[in-house]
Each structure stands twice: as structure tokens, then as C-alpha cells.
Regions:
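Short, small-residue-biased leader/transition segments that mark boundaries at the very start
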Residues: 1-6
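An alpha-beta-alpha
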Residues: 10-27, 34-40
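Gly/Ser/Thr-rich active-site loops/lids in small-molecule metabolic enzymes
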Residues: 11-17, 41-64, 111-126
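Active-site rim loops that border cofactor/substrate pockets in soluble metabolic enzymes
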Residues: 31-91
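Short acidic (Asp/Glu) and glycine-rich catalytic loops that position anionic groups and cofactors
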Residues: 24-31, 119-123
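Short glycine-rich anion-binding loops that position phosphate/pyrophosphate groups of nucleotides
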Residues: 34, 97-100
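Internal helix-turn-beta structural module
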Residues: 19, 83-84, 99, 104-150
Length: 150
């Protein structure tokens, strides 16, 4: 089931975040925050978050969350007060690859963030990819990241 794939991705992504010195707070992203919306896509992310919480009980995980509730403490106080992940998430599970790709390209181009990846997880060996729009520094950094994952 899709929720099992996302559950596994949460654990692998959190482990990768730890390799880079990030204390992961995982948000399963959606167009809904903790039941504010309805639909199959919401259910998929909510179920995946519940399975991930059960599988990784020591990992801060929440979902489903809208991106603003995941990263903004002010929005989180309104939409899900007292939630330990909401407003502080730093590790994101997107509902599909196209949404993840759009999100990272927006952060890179409008937010002027450095973007690396995609970083492919769950394989027998570290294998990564590069965007055709990357520069030489990003190629170098991906080589370092791939070596760190080996």
C-alpha cells in the first residue's frame, strides 16, 4: 500500500537527515491539516503518518499537515496548538514525487536555497541524481553526499 511506502520513506529520510546533522521532525504534507480536509489523498498521508509513528516511536512525526502549519510556529498555534512537530518540521514527506520536485525547485529558485538531489534512499548502495539545471558546485556537493552515504 502507498501508506507503507511513505512510512518507509519517513524512516529513511529521517536517517539521512541525521547523517547531515539535522535532528529530524517529520511532517507528512497534504492540503489538509489534521483532518481539516477530506479525501483519498488526505487519508493516504494521515494513514502513512500513523504507521510511521507506530514504526518509529522515538521519531517526532506528524501528519497530515499543510506546509504552512508544518513550518510556521504562528500558523501551527492557530491550526494545531500544542503539536510538537507542527511549526518546527524540518523533514518533509511529500504526497508524490511531482509535489516534492516542485517544492524543492521553488525553495531553490525563489528562496535562494542550495538544493541537492534527488537523494535516492532505500537502495543497496548510495545512488543519487542531478537536475539538468544544476551547476558545478552542486555536482561536487552531490559527489560528497553520495560518499557520505556509502
Amino acid at each position: 500500500a502507498a501508506s507503507d511506502v511513505y512510512k518507509r520513506q519517513a524512516g529513511e529520510t529521517a536517517q539521512c537527515a541525521k547523517i547531515f546533522g539535522v535532528d529530524p521532525k517529520v511532517a507528512f504534507l497534504s492540503y489538509s491539516t489534521l483532518g481539516s480536509g477530506k479525501g483519498e489523498d488526505v487519508d493516504k498521508m494521515r494513514n502513512a503518518a500513523a504507521k510511521a509513528k507506530a514504526k518509529y516511536p522515538d521519531l517526532p512525526i506528524e501528519g497530515e499537515l499543510q506546509f504552512d502549519a508544518a513550518v510556521s510556529p504562528r500558523v501551527a498555534r492557530t491550526k494545531c496548538p500544542g503539536n510538537p512537530v507542527a511549526g518546527h518540521a524540518n523533514t518533509f514527506i511529500f504526497p508524490e514525487i511531482s509535489a516534492g520536485n516542485i517544492g524543492y525547485k521553488i525553495a531553490q529558485r525563489l528562496g535562494n536555497f542550495e538544493a541537492y538531489g534527488p537523494i535516492l534512499l532505500g537502495l543497496n548502495a548510495p545512488i543519487n541524481d542531478l537536475s539538468r539545471g544544476c551547476n558545478a558546485a552542486e555536482v561536487y556537493s552531490m559527489a560528497i553526499i553520495t560518499a557520505a552515504l556509502a
